[in-house]
Amino acid sequence: MKTRTLNGAWTLEIPGTPFAAVPATVPGSVYHDLLAAERIPDPFYRDNEMEALKLMDNDFVYFRSFQVDDALLAGDKVLLRAEGLDTIAAVHINGQIVGEACNMHRIWEFDVKSVLHPGENTITVSFRSPTKYIKEAYAKSVADGSSDAMVGFPNIRKAHCMFGWDWGPRLPDAGIWRNISIISIEKARIQDVRVDQVHKDGTVRLRIHTNLNRYTDDEVWVNVSVTAPDGSVLTASGTDCELIVQNPQLWWPAGFGGQPLYQLSVSLCAKGKELDVWSRRIGLRTMTVSRRKDQWGESFSHCVNGVDIFAMGADYIPEDNLLPRVNPERTRRLLEDAKAANMNCIRVWGGGYYPDDFFYDICDELGLLVWQDFMFACAVYNLTDAFEENITAEFVDNVRRLRHHASLALWCGNNEMEQFVAQGEWVTSMRQKADYIKMYEYIIPKVLKAEDPQAFYWPASPSSGGSFDDPQDPTRGDVHYWMVWHGLLPFTDYRNHQFRYVSEFGFQSFPCMETIESFTAPEDRNVFSYVMEKHQRNASANGRILFYLSQMYLYPRSLELLVYASQLLQAQAMQYGVEHWRRHRGCCMGAVVWQLNDCWPVASWASIDYFGRWKALHYYEKRFFAPVLISCHEEGILSQNTNVNAEPFGLKKSAHLNVSNETMQKFRGKAKWSLRRPDASVIEEGSFDVTVPALSAVWLPEQDFSNYGTYDTYYSYQLLDEAGNGVGDGSVLFCAPKHFRFADPELNAFVKDDDIIVTAKGYARSVEIQAGADVVLSDNYFDMDGGVKAVKILRGSVDSVSVRSVWDIR
């Protein structure tokens, strides 16, 4: 098979506007090309989004010329292959229309042999205005959805969040966003390859099914090889063949074992000539979701190689509103940062797009389980015959593209639609409710049965199994829990719920000052300014951050301190939830934080901001997602929902340590504890011997401190392994930090080689090392009982360093 790439230099025109034609790059997009040509300002700066949005009321034309030789035209089939057209497009070659597209999530192929000729040819791809299209389509066929997005967004198969979301701007870009090429096929080609695995008696039987597109009656044959990580090779032949792998090296999620990958190659040959080749890496593993009746209801947990895994991870959204900016290097850093925070699971949220192949390749390498939503979110759809045909082709394209990946843990029908459709949200007819059932409980399962029969399918998130059967049932399936944040309940409310698997819960914070400065002018730097609220898409959420801040901290004297306090709020909210659910391992088997990343600079739920900068939450995640975690369920003012005006009160003050072990080995060690004063001097101290079986959690004896002060004592704890090495530590207060009688810890910090050395003379809570926004450290936002702590510089260069703690929030 010969390929003539059409990637590279094109020209972009915007008919009917004063814009002159500009050079364009494919893969690319309208915004990306206009920015490169300096024809529009940065849409992420201040409120430039509004002008950029108006631009999308236009149509757009991409064109170029290209050379074709006789060898390319000699093929038995010559196709134009477009792997991503965003979205409503018509394609002309040499002035003749060859095809139309209506779905950015699909691969489009058009027969072009009859319109090509030797020498110079021209291609034009015309895109309709996405904003006008959804307006016209909505007028003809009402399909409603989230009010954070533009009206009509469900009427187009385009990443929903491009039209706005409660964390993203309204920037519905357009263009040729993935590879485009001419392919010339001799005799036949490989259409797709499916690999099924049967694990039995210490061997893995690989069943390899190859589908061909044949264009002649000539004899062809298929050769298959599997190369193991050690270089050994197994071979077979035929469109349906089997290989038996002896002593297989199994693929495991991060934290449970290695991620060995086998190279599977399928070649199509005729008369000694290779016509086509399909080559991918696969991992040998079993993968499903355990659903068993138990004392709490019905379990829900990823089961890999027979082991039930506690999912520790985050929800992934598109990395950029300008899709051409997403590349393997950027995605690798983001996913490596997820793994660095001890995550083992990533949920690909259903309101964006199906990520590029490299996303899944990296997850395979890192051991990150992928919960894969189909691209439907917070909307209803009208299932016409044309729409059904369109989405079915979308499902087939993407299932075939992704199914071989070791990291693919499950397919999920949609985001949050079962619960909202069940409530009648967005539904304007009973037909739409019936269409919901047909789409997610008939069409998708039918496609998966044919294309990925070994995969686990879940109809929606959240769901209890489908058919509108109590989608948020806490005793089965997965839940999205938002009463903390959207419901304004306190952090401690998480402890009232055990759940089986929490696939969304979150809390917002502001990004760091350097990120805020990237999208604001000096006069904008107030959290209630127009620009700051334009970069806060969750309605009045800046005020919500301050509402929660009022419960926990003194009012900060500067925006910089407010940003710091907001990040602590976010981190501590998630800590309350995750630590609680890990303490109840077995009942709860998943804590997936909303969200991992941002698509533009914004105040949001992300733990890593648009520029890849770690917030406090990401450092906290590194601790509370640790394979072996020591945590403390404290009782005090916050947990008992009281306040200072209830004094004098009978207040329980206690500490109850727990060690959770998400490893395959028994853990033995020692838990050391101490009750201390604000200057970190010890009032009482002691220790517990700790033994925790693999894949379990153990409570240590509860300790009562009701006779000690509420505002001037704190509890500190540390876990050591048998060799005396520190495994984890922390501290808890018996009151809100705003009322604790902190003493100045007299923090100091300096750089020594690749370390930052922090010293404290007293209790320092949530110590933040400021060493540059792009610097990543081995630890940050940690507690100190006085003394000295050395922190490694993992990424970036440090010119100067400063340090602060909760004592400084005033």
Language-model features: locations:
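Flexible loop residues that form catalytic
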Residues: 128, 185, 351, 416, ...
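Secreted/periplasmic carbohydrate-active enzymes, especially glycoside hydrolases
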Residues: 1-345, 475, 583-584, 613, ...
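Substrate-binding clefts and catalytic carboxylate motifs of secreted carbohydrate-active enzymes
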Residues: 14-15, 172-175, 411, 446-449, ...
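Flexible loop/turn segments at secondary-structure boundaries
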Residues: 87-89, 132-134, 290, 318-321, ...
